Amino acid sequence: MVSLSVLLRGGLVLYGRDYKLTRADVLIEGDKIVEVKRNINKPADEVLDVSKSLVIPSFINAHTHSPMVILRGLAEDVPLMEWLQEYIWPVERKLRRKDVYWGSKLALIEMAHSGTSTFVDMYFHMEEIAKATEEVGLRAYLGYGMVDLDDEEKRKIEMRETEKLYEFIKKLDSSKVNFILAPHAPYTCSFDCLRWVSEKSREWNSLVTIHLAETQDEIKIIREKYGKSPVDVLEDVGLLNEKLIAAHGIWLSDEDIRKISSAGATIAHCPASNMKLGSGVFPMKKALENNVNVALGTDGAASNNTLDILREMRLASLLQKVIHRDPSIVKSEDIFRMATLNGAKALGLKAGVIAEGYLADIAVIDLRKAHLLPVNSPLASIIFSARGGDVDTLIVGGEIVMLDSELLTVDEEKVIDKFLEVSVA
């Protein structure tokens, strides 16, 4: 639903960067929040009563592969390399454009229901994901997943596909669909491929997303090939900078972490996928001590198996507490920022905060549920009690995408029925 102005009336608002809980109205004009205070006496095109709800910034999924919902449950209880080589890649080679379209559309519906407004996606047939993104109404950063395996002919194909997507998104000129460069990983992309990506990042002023230090196998492969760490390789090609969003970062050394911090790069932490594939535990304590910008991602639903950032926040917090045997090791404020403000910082968006002048990316959580009450600590309620279905309303760039738990942009039942026809599992 496109509105010139929206007034959220009487909600419990998580206001500002310090997350002060306040009873207030929120006025949205265009794509921005223009006023947050009690009793706003101004007309609006849409007035929503949120007096029994918690009003929070919507979430940013900093790393996913949305069409992989098609592969949910396909390969279970196996490590990453076996998971990829024996199960995922063989099936992905059979996926058609329409499979990617319907799979991503289902994924976007799932993300919307858990309060996600923005996501970073790496896959193929990205034009189909762009189409689904515009239809559902979320905001996407889409990159073609480049893999050349040191094959010069394959590299040329990957470069052409990337250039084609860049031109497609540029021509699309959408406020919701953005381009991002997406080399798969240092172990699947040659040095020349990574160097080309670095050059295009500067030429196109483009962000870059990549898998980094996800497994010990990756570290071993890169050290045998280059005699250094994957982070050093990215530094050598000119990719280690503030435009980089590196997923996982499990096996980073202390020196790697210092370099990432100095460069202003972002780590997209994916705790559920990391645990499910037995890949390891991200060194969050050291990353935060070194002021690394840490965002949150779900990874694909094939290795998670959901796209629920609320669940991801809970896992991110609990995992660190038990690994360090210290319940104070990470604060709820830090975890919540990873799902909101830190992701916005990585993408260069003025979002992730409910305050005047910020993008009107807002999720409304219905508090009329036993497992959410009482709200003694709003952040604790969100991180440890809430689940995806608790999000009642989603506003993306001032547009109401979901209201009363019903998507206004697409026929959800039709998408689910259609998905059953194209599922390859």
Swiss-Prot record:
Its EC number is 3.5.4.28, 3.5.4.31. InterPro entries: Amidohydro-rel, Deaminase_MtaD/DadD, Metal-dep_hydrolase_composite, Metal_Hydrolase, MTA/SAH_deaminase. It holds the Pfam family Amidohydro_1. CDD domains: ATZ_TRZ_like (cd01298). Substrate binds at residues 92, 184, 214, 299. Keywords: Hydrolase, Metal-binding, Zinc. Zn(2+) binds at residues 63, 65, 211, 299. Signal peptide: none annotated. The keyword Hydrolase applies. Binds 1 zinc ion per subunit. GO terms for molecular function: 5'-methylthioadenosine deaminase activity; metal ion binding; S-adenosylhomocysteine deaminase activity. SUPFAM superfamilies: Composite domain of metallo-dependent hydrolases, Metallo-dependent hydrolases. Its cofactor is Zn(2+). Catalyzes the deamination of 5-methylthioadenosine and S-adenosyl-L-homocysteine into 5-methylthioinosine and S-inosyl-L-homocysteine, respectively. Is also able to deaminate adenosine. Belongs to the metallo-dependent hydrolases superfamily. MTA/SAH deaminase family. HAMAP family: MTA_SAH_deamin. This is 5-methylthioadenosine/S-adenosylhomocysteine deaminase. The gene is mtaD.
